[in-house]
Amino acid sequence: MSTANPETPNSTISREASTQSSSAATSQGYILPEGKIMPNTVFVGGIDVRMDETEIRSFFARYGSVKEVKIITDRTGVSKGYGFVSFFNDVDVQKIVESQINFHGKKLKLGPAIRKQNLCAYHVQPRPLVFNHPPPPQFQNVWTNPNTETYMQPTTTMNPITQYVQAYPTYPNSPVQVITGYQLPVYNYQMPPQWPVGEQRSYVVPPAYSAVNYHCNEVDPGAEVVPNECSVHEATPPSGNGPQKKSVDRSIQTVVSCLFNPENRLRNSVVTQDDYFKDKRVHHFRRSRAMLKSV
């Protein structure tokens, strides 16, 4: 007496699924990719370029009510040679796959439609890089003078579009601190002070003047030289008849003294512009005093 083991519906479904998957893995000698098997859908390969969806629909209508025919094409619209045929009702996909179908004298490559499993692709959304603006760098001259001068550089505005620039860490001991996409070399220039420590620096600007040179000609000592005096006659007031005052230009006197004293020619040969204007101011002062006395 033999007892039959009753089969449950769950065991039947699992056995059919395992049989379908195992047979699909070796369909017509081709190793199929891993993925989810689409129900009531058949993969059709080896489609000729002359075939269209209408002909394929009419051909596979013998196996059931065709829901959709999809031929895969490239960007230019040219067929890649394979497609998918889906049915409305439940059909025996394994029976269709095992059948030998020749269409337009060309054997079709049939198989179950498998949707590839999406790999675990970690989508990393780029985050904007936040720039913490550091204080402006300070450039200090490395001198021994305690009164060091500090030059401030204006802060550079970072473009918000450049979000993927890696900022290198700064070094606190470097005299220049700049945060950019690359590290700048640091150079320390040491110069000795040009003035004593603690002494106040004063800048002397030389006056811009041109020297006026009065050259005297060589005069024979034995020759008689008559001094020429440049007399300036002042206008006398209409009410008085006082004597007219006579003033002599000091520059003319300098030339005359140079002529009479040959030993002082080199010393008095050059008269600068400052001495000339100084003598002229004294001349004007004496001239004004003479006018006051005459009045």
UniProtKB/Swiss-Prot annotation:
**Residue list for modification Phosphotyrosine:** Y276
Q: Compositional bias (Low complexity) spans? A: 11-25
The record's keywords, sorted A to Z, are:
Cytoplasm, Developmental protein, Differentiation, Nucleus, Phosphoprotein, RNA-binding, Spermatogenesis, Translation regulation
DAZ domain: residues covered: 167-190
Q: Where is this region: Homodimerization?
A: 80-132
- Provide the GO biological process annotations: 3'-UTR-mediated mRNA stabilization; female meiosis II; germ cell development; oocyte maturation; positive regulation of meiotic nuclear division; positive regulation of translational initiation; spermatogenesis
Tissues expressed in? Testis specific.
Which Pfam families does the annotation name? Daz, RRM_1
Location(s), subcellular = Cytoplasm; Nucleus
The UniProt family comment states:
Belongs to the RRM DAZ family.
Record-linked PANTHER family: BOULE-RELATED (PTHR11176), DELETED IN AZOOSPERMIA-LIKE (PTHR11176:SF4)
Subunit-level organization: Homodimer and heterodimer. Multiple DAZL RRMs can bind to a single RNA containing multiple GUU triplets. Forms a heterodimer with DAZ. Interacts with BOLL, DAZAP1 and DAZAP2. Interacts with PUM2.
Protein name (database record): Deleted in azoospermia-like
Record the organism.
Homo sapiens
Top-down, what is the taxonomic lineage of the species of origin? Eukaryota, Metazoa, Chordata, Craniata, Vertebrata
